[in-house]
Curated annotation (Swiss-Prot):
GO cellular component: extracellular region
Signal peptide: 1-23
PANTHER family in the record: MANNOSE, PHOSPHOLIPASE, LECTIN RECEPTOR RELATED
Taxonomic lineage of the native organism: Eukaryota, Metazoa, Chordata, Craniata, Vertebrata
Pfam families found in the cross-reference section: Lectin_C (PF00059)
Disulfide bridge partners, by residue number: 25-36, 53-142, 119-134
Tissue: Expressed by the venom gland.
Keyword Disulfide bond on entry: yes
Name the record gives this protein: Snaclec CTL-Eoc124
UniProt source species: Echis ocellatus
Assembly notes: Heterodimer; disulfide-linked.
Subcellular location: Secreted
Length: 146
């Protein structure tokens, strides 16, 4: 009986330690502060990338960022796979209504861009965004809430 209680308690501890640490993310997705992230080595336009992300997970969109640490986390996922390259992120004025927005509807509370044009990519080497032609093709960074 004592062994059963010990094993049951051990399993409970393992379960509780895994909850919220990625156990809730889909396979191949990485958890960070209540969201799951995945970088895809597939080139597509910004509009196709946003559609692709919405098809990958419930609540999925191109990644939005709210701190430099969050961008650094995405870079840590992207650089080993893509080396020096770019990934689409959710920031755009794709609809040309003169209002910069995240595709997931999140508040624009952190900015790290330069250049011009209507969509954004993030470099895979540092915390910098570039305004980019939406019709060009790039790899994809997706995010969904837990």
């Amino acid at each position: 009986m004592g062994r059963f209680i010990s094993v049951s308690f051990g399993l409970l501890v393992v379960f509780l330690s895994l909850s919220g640490t990625g156990a809730d993310c889909l396979p191949d997705w990485s958890p960070y502060q209540g969201h799951c992230y995945r970088v895809f080595n597939q080139k597509m336009t910004w509009a196709d990338a946003e559609k692709f992300c919405t098809e990958q997970a419930n609540g999925g969109h191109l990644a939005s960022f709210h701190s430099s640490k969050e961008v650094d986390f995405m870079v840590s996922l992207a650089f080993p796979m893509l080396k020096v390259d770019f990934v689409w992120i959710g920031m755009s004025d794709f609809w040309r209504d003169c209002e910069w927005k995240w595709s997931d509807g999140a508040k624009l509370d952190y900015k790290a861009w330069n250049n011009e044009l209507n969509c954004f990519v993030s470099k895979t080497t540092d915390n910098q965004w570039l305004r980019w032609d939406c019709s060009r093709t790039n790899n994809v960074a997706c995010k969904y809430p837990l």
